[in-house]
Amino acid sequence: MLNRVVLVGRLTKDPEYRTTPSGVSVATFTLAVNRTFTNAQGEREADFINCVVFRRQADNVNNYLSKGSLAGVDGRLQSRNYENQEGRRVFVTEVVCDSVQFLEPKNAQQNGGQRQQNEFQDYGQGFGGQQSGQNNSYNNSSNTKQSDNPFANANGPIDISDDDLPF
């Protein structure tokens, strides 16, 4: 059987953190995940998915995620039940996370969720937008590989049998 869940969403509130009597760290949080389609009014609805994570990942979630943080989770769906204070049976379905990925810088939430304009400007520099005075050895050496292409001077169709193709 297959039980796998992969979600990307934003935390609806700060994670709740506790330690079990046996010393295991536990963090619970709710992810708001947008649906891929719109409703009759043209708005996207969201699902609110309960998640739980244990041990070191729980410590990291507690230390680095907060309300509004963008996170990706990978885990499995699990159902459990318990009896509440009124004596009623309560059923809970949640994602038990094997992995939680932090999908934005920690300081992104300090600006109300808005990125500063220059926050990511340096990321494009390695892809041809070299600034003056910057020594980028990747750009200098990447163009020398063109002569290694065995088909660079081919003038017609390539003669290859179907038996030589890997598919």
Curated annotation (Swiss-Prot):
It comes from the Bacteria. Residues 109-118, 132-147 have a biased composition (Low complexity). Signal peptide: none annotated. GO terms for biological process: DNA recombination; DNA repair; DNA replication. A motif (Important for interaction with partner proteins) lies at residues 162-167. Residues 107-167 are annotated as: Disordered. It holds the Pfam family SSB. SUPFAM superfamilies: Nucleic acid-binding proteins. The keyword DNA damage applies. Residues 1-104 form the SSB domain. Keywords: DNA damage, DNA recombination, DNA repair, DNA replication, DNA-binding. One of its GO terms (cellular component) is nucleoid. InterPro entries: NA-bd_OB-fold (IPR012340), Primosome_PriB/ssb (IPR000424), ssDNA-bd (IPR011344). The keyword tRNA processing does not apply. PANTHER family: SINGLE-STRANDED DNA-BINDING PROTEIN (PTHR10302:SF27). Homotetramer. Plays an important role in DNA replication, recombination and repair. Binds to ssDNA and to an array of partner proteins to recruit them to their sites of action during DNA metabolism. This is Single-stranded DNA-binding protein 1.
